[in-house]
Amino acid sequence: MDTSSAAGSGAGTGDVCPCSTVATSTTSASNEQPQTKRQKIEQQIKVGSKALPPQPPHPPDILDLDANSNSHLCSSLSSSSSHSLSTPSTANNSPTTTPCSSRAASYAQLLHNILPQNGDTDLHSQPESAHDEVDRAAKLPNLLTLDTTNGNGSHASSRSNCLQATTATSIDDMLEFEQSLTRQCLCGVSERTLRKPFQSHYSQDTNGQKRIAYLREWPTNKLLQFLSNLQLLFDIYLKQNAKGFICTRIMDVCDALIRNDHKLIDEIIVLAGYENSYVQFLAGRVLAAFLVIAKQELNDEWLQKIVDQLFNFEQLDQAAVQKIHFSLDIIKRIVEWKDMEIHPLDDDWMASANSTSAASSVVPLSTEASVSYMHFPVQEQPLATNYFALQFREDTEGERETGQEAPDNRDRHRRHFGEDMNVAYEPHPAPQSTTMPSGCHVVTLTDSESFDTTHLKCITIQKLEHKWPTLVKNMSELMAPTHQDAAEHCVLNFLQLWENIISVKANLSIDETRPYYAQLDKFELLLSHSLSCTVYKQMLCLFNEALCYGSTLALQDMLPEETCKLAHQIVCHVRGFRILESLPRRQPDNMVSLIGYNGKPMVYANGTITLAHAAQSGDSEEDGAPLDLIEMDKTLLQKMVLLVLKSIAVTVKEIRSDSSDSSIDSTDYDAFQDMMLIERSIRDVLSKLETFIKQTLEFHPECHFSKILIHLFDDQDDHLIEAMVCTLDVTSGISFRNNAFPELVAMLNPVYTFLEFLKMTSNSSDLLLDLLVSNETCFLLYLLRLLKYIRMNWTMFVHSCHTFGMGSAMLDEAMGVLIRLRLQISRLVSRQLYPYDISPVLRLLESCESLYEGNELS
């Protein structure tokens, strides 16, 4: 029984069950002359239209698949305020000028009845769509045996049975829809099943008339289910879009969502003020995914409304914080959106996939294989055309099989990528449609613009740029102790957004991100021990990203002024102990260490969960003993030390770039005196940092700074390598003139740091090779500069090896690791297996090896 159709026919009859409605009309006509089924249906329509105002012809499904009887698309740009269904005509009403044979024709009325249009509560229906719906409802009198003489009991029983059947069918349809999306294909889903997840909700106005409710008026459970379905659909679309293969039906549904003008996005934006936190979370995810999918077809008003919510409030109360958090989460997800890239380790798999692609399109697969096949492989990225999609070679038989469907796919692809925006269409990047063994029709995208979100990121950043100082000021107020607990989630979202904007991974230009560096030095003043550990940690992440030394600043000749200003301020605050003392500390609770249990025993009364009186009284007497223990989070300490080292390295690099100016003589006495003052200041900062780390982590007072550094970052490879680059650059930058300032060189000594690193890795050349191949650290930059330093200061390197090992053969061990590394790299290069040009490192390794073999001191 088509219960969804039955429900649709009775939607306009108030709260009466569709089954009982049909039964009543049948009883009223029993005393008349015999009539055909069509006459009975028309009689029922006339009676219903006289008794009630016009109502929707069926439940307000978002996917209104039945009204499009002539396969004509409804205009989504020129519809009136009533938004009535388009009448069948010979003209095509679609702004996309899609032929009526298009696959998307059945989704033309997407979102037509989901929401009230422009405040109208009266809905108008078309006779054609009503006839179509009643045709299906006409089956009910023959399928249901209804006795109208049984009174209210029979009426209630039939209504209950109908509701139970409708509920069971809806659950089954919902389960089928979700399982199909899990398999990443909607090709086998019926139209009725596709409607169920997107059904709207009715409410009554002040006059007692039924109308389609706004999203904010929906029940929480139904709203959560609706938003979850949208999120799941968008997530599947984005994953397939990133890989270059999209199920045609998923593509059509998302395309219809993008082209609707029924205020759905505006209604979801209004959910920022919804009381349920789960609804807010889902609404933010849906909006972010929708904006990423829309891209060039983006409505500028959507982004503007999201940005305006950051500032449209009279006071920073809980409601304002909630809306700010909602908008920040959407903008953050847009900025941090990363296009999927192929992993270097997947090259072998891709090669085998390419060699067997033709065979895999013919050989039938099992059920499990067909499901896993829908998780399409990531396509390679040819550099010549900048396309992100891989052009698969199809055999002649495959081309013949898919030849009839190709024109339709080209029309579909052309409509999806900008024909509404009057963009000139080139036939070269047309999608290719293939039928998978599981029965899914897949479109292969070859348009690089379909994968690029740079335009969306730039628009978002530009809209936020001029209002950024105001937002920073508001966030500074929320970080006050009075607001900190209630607004911590909002502050964390803001800090993460700021970090993502200035991050190198965002692929934004320097001019676009420069305004976001201007407020960093003022924001650094907010570092305080009163902040929570999570907020403090995120602030350190923000400043470390601004001073991205290993990935960016170390490779630049001229450093940005805003970055240098932030580095100078941090160095000054370290000298005054302000920033180091601002690290939040906490007292350990029931901490178990190597020397035993440091917490207080908790004694409970027998059979209860309340503390015994003896334990409570004992607590008050022994409060002073364990409270002397102060614990500091190691992650916070790591980020703070790395931030200080980066600031020192940036300061030294800026000084060296200024002093290397051709207008300054290398023997200038005043310049040398300035360098002495700077070196003394840097040495003072490093001494205070070293003392602070030793006191916090309980190192021996005579322990060298290099050992402290290696063991502090022993669980963070990226932080460790970047810290080693900083110490190496500070040493070589300060002492670049005739090995001046030996005190600073002895304090940092990059050779000690390298030897301590080899000791920690057990002299493994394999690990060094892994770090060279990986792009997760800046080890290539470190090794290149270290080898140059060793070659220029060979005597100092040999002497440091002897003093570090206390007479042991540290020189032989260190050079043995470097020689083995050179041999491993040479073998990979000879087989053309190395991923990039490593010849500069090979030449430096050979140069150091020749010095080692000809060195008399070794």
UniProtKB/Swiss-Prot annotation:
<dbReference type="GO" id="GO:0008544">
    <property type="term" value="P:epidermis development"/>
</dbReference>
<keyword id="KW-0805">Transcription regulation</keyword>
<comment type="subunit">
    <text>Interacts with drm.</text>
</comment>
<dbReference type="InterPro" id="IPR029415">
    <property type="entry name" value="Lines_C"/>
</dbReference>
<dbReference type="Pfam" id="PF14695">
    <property type="entry name" value="LINES_C"/>
</dbReference>
<feature type="region of interest" description="Disordered">
    <location>
        <begin position="1"/>
        <end position="102"/>
    </location>
</feature>
<comment type="similarity">
    <text>Belongs to the protein lines family.</text>
</comment>
<dbReference type="GO" id="GO:0007442">
    <property type="term" value="P:hindgut morphogenesis"/>
</dbReference>
<keyword id="KW-0217">Developmental protein</keyword>
<keyword id="KW-0709">Segmentation polarity protein</keyword>
<keyword id="KW-0804">Transcription</keyword>
<dbReference type="GO" id="GO:0048619">
    <property type="term" value="P:embryonic hindgut morphogenesis"/>
</dbReference>
<dbReference type="GO" id="GO:0016055">
    <property type="term" value="P:Wnt signaling pathway"/>
</dbReference>
<feature type="compositionally biased region" description="Low complexity">
    <location>
        <begin position="20"/>
        <end position="30"/>
    </location>
</feature>
<keyword id="KW-0678">Repressor</keyword>
<dbReference type="Pfam" id="PF14694">
    <property type="entry name" value="LINES_N"/>
</dbReference>
<protein>
    <recommendedName>
        <fullName>Protein lines</fullName>
    </recommendedName>
</protein>
<keyword id="KW-0010">Activator</keyword>
<dbReference type="GO" id="GO:0007440">
    <property type="term" value="P:foregut morphogenesis"/>
</dbReference>
<dbReference type="GO" id="GO:0045944">
    <property type="term" value="P:positive regulation of transcription by RNA polymerase II"/>
</dbReference>
<keyword id="KW-0539">Nucleus</keyword>
<dbReference type="GO" id="GO:0007367">
    <property type="term" value="P:segment polarity determination"/>
</dbReference>
<dbReference type="InterPro" id="IPR024875">
    <property type="entry name" value="Protein_Lines"/>
</dbReference>
<keyword id="KW-0879">Wnt signaling pathway</keyword>
<dbReference type="GO" id="GO:0009880">
    <property type="term" value="P:embryonic pattern specification"/>
</dbReference>
<keyword id="KW-0963">Cytoplasm</keyword>
<dbReference type="GO" id="GO:0035220">
    <property type="term" value="P:wing disc development"/>
</dbReference>
<dbReference type="GO" id="GO:0009946">
    <property type="term" value="P:proximal/distal axis specification"/>
</dbReference>
<dbReference type="GO" id="GO:0048617">
    <property type="term" value="P:embryonic foregut morphogenesis"/>
</dbReference>
<dbReference type="InterPro" id="IPR032794">
    <property type="entry name" value="LINES_N"/>
</dbReference>
<comment type="function">
    <text>Has a dual role as a segment polarity protein and as a modulator of the Abd-B protein. Required for Abd-B to activate the transcription of genes (including ems, cut and sal) that are involved in posterior spiracle morphogenesis. Also required for Abd-B to form an eighth abdominal denticle belt. Acts in a hierarchy downstream of drm and upstream of bowl during foregut and hindgut patterning and morphogenesis. Involved in cell rearrangement during elongation of the embryonic hindgut.</text>
</comment>
<dbReference type="GO" id="GO:0035277">
    <property type="term" value="P:spiracle morphogenesis, open tracheal system"/>
</dbReference>
<dbReference type="GO" id="GO:0005737">
    <property type="term" value="C:cytoplasm"/>
</dbReference>
<dbReference type="GO" id="GO:0005634">
    <property type="term" value="C:nucleus"/>
</dbReference>
<feature type="compositionally biased region" description="Low complexity">
    <location>
        <begin position="65"/>
        <end position="102"/>
    </location>
</feature>
